[in-house]
């Protein structure tokens, strides 16, 4: 019996040992299974993350924020090593779900067609980074464009280019996604500067690069500006086309002038000088050296400093009358001959033209934004640019070609000036022709031109352009602008804009299509306007009084510059226009005191006479 009992005891012990070994093996198997599941989840998550984020050394990384799924995957993988088995299993499941969710949210792959390829991608912004000084370009897409490889390629195009060339190379590449961004060097003030370039994104399709976005320019050149001068704080809109021979005197102080316009014809400032006191100014910009007449520049220095000292803000008008033999690159190719117009279309149609315009604009902005030479807060590019034949000559062409030429030149001036003085305002100037629709007109309607101008700027990257207008009466000698005229109506399709219907202009500029990117109205100045005393000095004065009151009541006119301080003998001889506050001989006209007191507490006293002449109570 004892032997049997011992035998059974040993048998049970062996059985217990056998069951223990089986339990151990089962436990180890479960651990291995858990570990395998965990590793599989980690690998799947890692593969997904690596697939999404791994980039080759020469590619630009995507700036997309980390998604919730990607964040969860990373968190699960990092924390799993420190969790108990049950929590580890939960983490594995969570990781797997995150991976599945992320995979499910991958952008659709879309085939490119003739209908969708040109604007498949949208460049949302193209701006200079305040932190890095590089050009940051943000892009969105409805999905992943199907092409030869997995990349989007970024190209830069010159201002004058209208597409990619066969030999052109990309400046950056990135893995495709529905949202990507590039960051490239600006190379400001270097020979290969990209400040005036536009940027476009392409894919490689059938072995060649196919652009799939609309090109876009840099829209914030002010990010690299040295100066931020935006003008003085003025208490009225009163301005004047000043007489340079009277700047040093007391008349401008007596008149209480706040704003002044002054021309800068390029023929005056370009080239060398033999003056020992004011030698030639050598200026290098973007790898090219230019020369400015030191003696003439000194004259502008004195003029602008003197005006500023009198509390007067300046609007400088840059005009192209440069010699087409000495400086052909400044003038548009079809404007270099065939006209006796005083000024020509600027040239941004080739590299030499862009470099010349940008250098001139950069030089002027730099000289007249800091201390020591006077300051200019407003820059007007050209004169009455819709008046093609008379004031901004270019060989006759369609309005689209003409406006495109001006728009490109304007943007060059804009980027050059704003990259030096971020506070400056840049203006496009129009005359009073608005919507004539006259088939024999050698000029263009201002409405048509500004529509094309604004649309192009929006399409290629909107900027803070502004409007300068000349609402002369029609005809110009008609001082009584309030009298009815079939050409001057209160509707948007009026043939002419004068001070009688100036609200048509400001209402038009209040449309959504004309507003700045922040939703505000653009600056509007009346940089040239006036009334002749040829039909009587009191009529001239009454016209000014009524016009000024209308401008103030309108509320959207930032400044008005009356033409002019002193009658111009050539205008009287050629056109019969005596527009000045003073006669050629220097005596004050009736308008002098009206102008002087129009923005003071004595305004009503000096304008009361005008109500009977105008026939209106204003």
Which residues fall in each region the model found?
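Aromatic-rich peripheral "rim/lid" segments of glycoside hydrolase catalytic domains that contact
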Residues: 390, 536-550, 554-618
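Noncatalytic carbohydrate-binding groove/subsite architecture in carbohydrate-active enzymes
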Residues: 360, 372-375, 402-538
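Substrate-binding cleft and catalytic face of glycoside hydrolase catalytic domains
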Residues: 258-436, 474-475, 567-572
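Boundary/entry segment of secreted carbohydrate-active catalytic domains
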Residues: 212-268
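Aromatic/hydrophobic beta-strand junction motif of beta-rich domains
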Residues: 133-146
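Short, aromatic- and glycine-rich surface loops/edge beta-strands on solvent-exposed regions
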Residues: 193-208
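Gram-positive cell-envelope targeting signals
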Residues: 1-78
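Short, compositionally biased P/S/T/A/G/V-rich stretches that sit at domain boundaries
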Residues: 91-131
């Amino acid at each position: 019996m004892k032997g049997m009992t011992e035998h059974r005891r040993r048998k049970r012990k062996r059985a217990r040992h056998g069951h223990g070994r089986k339990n151990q093996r089962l436990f180890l198997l479960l651990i291995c299974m858990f570990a395998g599941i965990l590793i599989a989840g980690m690998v799947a998550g890692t593969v997904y993350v690596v697939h999404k984020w791994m980039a080759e050394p020469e590619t630009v990384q995507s700036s997309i924020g980390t998604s919730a799924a990607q964040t969860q995957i990373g968190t699960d993988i990092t924390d799993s090593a420190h969790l108990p088995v049950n929590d580890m299993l939960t983490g594995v499941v969570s990781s797997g779900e995150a991976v599945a969710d992320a995979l499910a949210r991958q952008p659709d792959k879309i085939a490119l067609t003739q209908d969708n390829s040109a604007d498949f991608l949208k460049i949302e912004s193209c701006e200079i980074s305040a932190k890095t000084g590089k050009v940051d370009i943000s892009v969105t897409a409805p999905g992943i464009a199907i092409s030869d490889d997995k990349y989007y390629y970024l190209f830069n195009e010159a201002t004058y280019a209208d597409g990619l060339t066969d030999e052109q190379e990309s400046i950056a590449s990135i893995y495709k996604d529905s949202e990507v961004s590039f960051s490239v060097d600006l190379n400001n003030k270097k020979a290969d500067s990209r400040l005036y370039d536009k940027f476009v994104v392409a894919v490689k399709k059938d072995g060649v690069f196919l652009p799939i976005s609309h090109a876009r320019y840099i829209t914030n050149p002010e990010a690299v500006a040295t100066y931020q001068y935006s003008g003085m704080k003025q208490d009225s809109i009163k301005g004047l086309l000043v007489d340079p021979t009277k700047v040093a005197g007391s008349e401008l102080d007596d008149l209480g002038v706040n704003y002044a316009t002054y021309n800068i014809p390029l023929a005056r400032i370009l080239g060398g000088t033999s003056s020992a006191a004011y030698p030639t100014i050598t200026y290098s910009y973007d790898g090219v050296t230019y020369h400015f007449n030191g003696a003439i520049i000194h004259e502008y220095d004195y003029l602008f400093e003197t005006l500023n000292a009198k509390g007067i803000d300046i609007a400088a008008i840059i005009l192209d009358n440069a010699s087409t033999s000495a400086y052909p690159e400044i003038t548009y190719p079809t404007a270099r001959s065939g006209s006796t117009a005083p000024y020509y279309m600027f040239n941004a149609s080739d590299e030499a033209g862009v470099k010349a315009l940008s250098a001139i604009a950069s030089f002027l902005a730099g000289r007249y934004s800091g201390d020591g030479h006077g300051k200019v807060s407003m820059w007007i590019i050209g004169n009455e640019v819709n008046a093609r034949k008379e004031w901004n000559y270019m060989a006759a062409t369609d309005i689209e070609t003409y406006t495109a030429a001006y728009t490109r030149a304007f943007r060059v001036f804009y980027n050059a000036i704003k990259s030096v003085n971020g506070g400056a305002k840049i203006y496009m100037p129009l005359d009073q022709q608005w919507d004539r629709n006259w088939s024999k007109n050698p000029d263009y309607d201002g409405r048509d031109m500004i529509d094309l101008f604004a649309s192009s700027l929006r399409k290629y990257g909107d900027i803070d352009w502004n409007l300068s207008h000349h609402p002369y009466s029609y005809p110009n000698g008609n001082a009584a602008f309030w009298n009815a005229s079939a050409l001057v109506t209160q509707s948007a399709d009026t043939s002419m804009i004068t001070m009688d219907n100036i609200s048509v202009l400001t209402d038009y500029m209040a449309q959504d299509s004309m507003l700045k990117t922040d939703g505000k109205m653009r600056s509007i100045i009346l940089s040239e306007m006036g009334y002749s005393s040829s039909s009587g000095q009191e009529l001239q004065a009454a016209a000014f009084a009524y016009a000024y009151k209308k401008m103030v009541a309108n509320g959207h006119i930032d400044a008005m510059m009356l033409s002019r301080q002193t009658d111009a003998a050539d205008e009287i001889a050629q056109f019969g226009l005596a527009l000045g506050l003073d006669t050629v001989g220097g005596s004050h006209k009736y308008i002098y005191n009206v102008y002087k007191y129009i923005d003071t507490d004595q305004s009503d006293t000096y304008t009361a006479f005008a109500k009977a002449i105008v026939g209106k109570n204003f």
